[in-house]
A protein has these predicted regions:
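Long C-terminal interaction/binding lobes of large macromolecular proteins
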Residues: 1-256
Length: 256
């Protein structure tokens, strides 16, 4: 036996989704918490892995290593849960202090500030709306006011979000109109009047009356739980107070 045996402690992280929006058979269906291991030098190696960084999968690999339950696929995590888990891992591994460079909207100066991650993450609970039905598989069904189409929507997973980003980047690279609003709606629409064909759904969204489109976006925004990462900072130059959206990137784990 080595004199340096060390068993990493574990801790529980609350899921903002409360496991409600995962389909039956998913390891997080109905689960309100996930157990993570404490970060070690092994996880730091993952954060600096050049191959993972180039492929854009470093955060998924980090969570995969930290999960006690290895049956959980990080790519299948809802974005809200994924971000909450990464926040918890960052605080557990490096503490809650997060140094940032902020731009003052009043005097336009750039200044250094420190954000307390314990107070940064704010979870907005899902709302109940008339006419919106929670289906047994974690999806939502809503009837649109103008067309009367019955639309089924899902909360985005990390894989869905990555796929949306790739679609928009490919369109931009090929000088194709990005239609970002349409693509964004398309990313969370599962079916319209029972039709699941992607081309048909895209066409329907493109021609959807503005009133229907607005309601659909509001239902997605309000009826699924969401996370905000806004912090109030004070400019060190002019002393003006501003609300700043803290960017969530890999540098989140690299700050000194």
């Amino acid at each position: 036996n080595s004199a340096f045996n060390y068993i990493s402690p574990t801790y529980l992280v609350d899921l903002p989704s409360k496991g409600v929006f995962y389909p039956g058979g998913h390891p997080l269906n109905g689960k309100t918490t996930v157990e993570l291991r404490e970060m070690t030098a092994k996880e730091e190696d993952i954060l600096f892995n050049k191959s993972f960084l180039e492929r854009g999968i470093v955060l998924e690999k980090l969570l995969q290593s930290l999960f006690v339950d290895k049956s959980i696929d990080p790519a299948s995590l809802l974005v809200i849960d994924k971000n909450a888990l990464l926040f918890a891992a960052r605080i557990n591994g490096y503490g809650p202090e997060y140094p940032i460079k902020a731009n003052c909207p009043a005097c336009l100066s750039q200044f250094d500030s420190v954000v307390d991650l314990n107070t940064l993450l704010k979870i907005r609970e899902k709302e109940k709306k008339d006419g919106v039905i929670l289906l047994s598989n974690g999806l939502l069904s809503v009837t649109l006011p103008v067309t009367k189409w019955v639309v089924v929507i899902k909360p985005l997973s990390g894989a869905d979000q990555d796929n949306l980003q790739k679609i928009l980047e490919t369109k931009k690279k090929n000088n194709i109109d990005q239609n970002s609003l349409i693509e964004n709606i398309r990313s969370y629409v599962v079916s319209i009047n029972g039709v699941i064909d992607g081309t048909s759904i895209y066409e329907a969204i493109t021609n959807m009356p503005a009133r229907d489109s607005k309601l659909l976006r509001n239902v997605y925004s309000d009826c699924f739980p969401n996370i905000t990462t806004t912090s109030q900072v004070v400019c060190t130059v002019c002393r003006e107070t501003a609300d700043l959206e803290v960017p969530f990137t890999i540098s989140f784990f690299w700050s000194k």
